[in-house]
């Protein structure tokens, strides 16, 4: 599968796109609390336990224990009580990002401050703070990704316009790119304009994001009427739709480059979905590590006995995100962290 907009403009005009993303084939897939993370961790933990590894549950690490300059264990909370655990060879931090730590977000990634975090509340930045307390260095703490909460099956069949009634991004690109463009460049103002036939087609299409489908916020027989209902500048949406339809009649989108398979004239009845504020950010920066997942001190030297992986580190996607990168990053460097700690 395509995972980061590589098959959309402008990237598909620069390099021939290739689907390099992978969807794990899992039986009885779930969403929610027993969704992605749970389904990935369950077989890993079960396999480890069969090999004799002891698993502890309902623990929340508070700090690490240091003997001299070496990390030798952790102190955690379980049901309000402290639990100390000795680590003979090392401690691996894999506790998520800081997307739910408002103060850390305000200080390091203010562009997403005040917007819903597209992650779970356990992403509180504690692992980063634990590392920093030992003098650990960090990198790309301002790096973020922005999710956009709308079903792509609807977006590709309509046009996304900003608060001035203008299109600003190809609707068939990676939703993360749409999220960043909407929040950072359009003041979080976005509307999906779509006609009745395209809306019904999108609602009936197979989708991995059906929970993100939305009902129209406004409906009208003409674009002029819809424009007025939406409170857009007079004539702005009309000119946008007219230009889009002129080229769509020939199956092209020379303005933004949406692929021809999704380009069709928008004809009445018309609808618009209010997508203002439908963005949620998460953080990509974190602890600086080596290729062996050793946490680096600000001096540049590894902190003995301390390793880290996943979103609490500044991984491969700090400069930009693609779907699944956190899983790839976390699993690859998590394995390297385990190997390094076991030496």
Regions found by a protein language model. Give the residues of each.
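Hydrophobic alpha-helical segments, especially N-terminal targeting/anchoring helices
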Residues: 65, 161-162, 289, 296-297, ...
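An anion/pyrophosphate-binding glycine-rich loop and adjacent beta-alpha core
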Residues: 124, 128-130, 137-236
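A glycine-rich dinucleotide-binding beta-alpha-beta segment and adjacent secondary-structure elements
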Residues: 236-320
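Glycine-rich loop(s) and the adjacent beta-strand/alpha-helix scaffold that form part
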Residues: 35, 78-148, 327, 333-336
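Rossmann-like flavin
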Residues: 1-16, 218-237, 242-243
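Glycine-rich phosphate/pyrophosphate-binding beta-alpha loops
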Residues: 147-154, 173-179, 278-284, 311-327
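Conserved redox-cofactor binding core of oxidoreductases
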Residues: 1-82, 102-104, 248-267
């Amino acid at each position: 599968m395509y995972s980061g907009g590589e098959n959309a403009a402008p990237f598909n005009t620069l390099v021939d796109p290739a689907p390099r993303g992978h969807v794990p084939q899992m039986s009885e897939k779930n969403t929610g609390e027993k969704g992605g993370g749970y389904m990935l961790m369950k077989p890993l933990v079960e396999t480890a336990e069969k090999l004799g590894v002891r698993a502890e549950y309902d623990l929340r690490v508070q700090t690490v224990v240091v003997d001299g300059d070496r990390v030798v264990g952790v102190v955690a909370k379980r049901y309000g009580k402290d639990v100390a655990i000795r680590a003979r060879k090392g401690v691996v931090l894999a506790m998520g990002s800081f997307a739910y730590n408002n103060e850390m977000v305000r200080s390091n990634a203010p562009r997403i401050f005040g917007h819903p975090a597209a992650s779970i509340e356990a992403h509180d930045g504690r692992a980063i703070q634990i590392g920093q307390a030992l003098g650990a260095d960090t990198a790309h703490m301002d790096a973020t990704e922005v999710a956009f909460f709308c079903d792509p099956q609807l977006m590709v069949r309509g046009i996304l316009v900003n608060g001035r009634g203008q299109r600003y991004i190809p609707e068939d690109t990676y939703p993360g790119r749409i999220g960043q463009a909407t929040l950072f460049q359009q003041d979080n103002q976005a509307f999906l304009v779509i006609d009745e036939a395209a809306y019904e087609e999108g609602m009936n299409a197979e989708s991995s994001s059906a929970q993100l489908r939305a009902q129209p916020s406004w409906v009208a027989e003409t674009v002029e009427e819809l424009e007025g209902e939406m409170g857009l500048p007079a004539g702005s949406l009309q000119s946008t739709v007219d230009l889009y339809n002129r080229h769509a009649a020939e199956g092209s989108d020379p303005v933004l480059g949406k692929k021809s398979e999704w380009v069709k004239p928008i004809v009445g009845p018309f609808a618009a979905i209010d997508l203002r504020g439908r963005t949620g950010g998460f953080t990509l920066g974190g602890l600086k590590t080596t290729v062996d997942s050793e946490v680096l001190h600000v001096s540049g030297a590894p902190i003995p006995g301390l390793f880290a992986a996943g979103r609490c580190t500044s991984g491969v996607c700090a400069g930009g995100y693609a779907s699944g990168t956190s899983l790839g990053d976390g699993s690859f460097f998590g394995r390297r962290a385990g190997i390094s700690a076991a030496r």
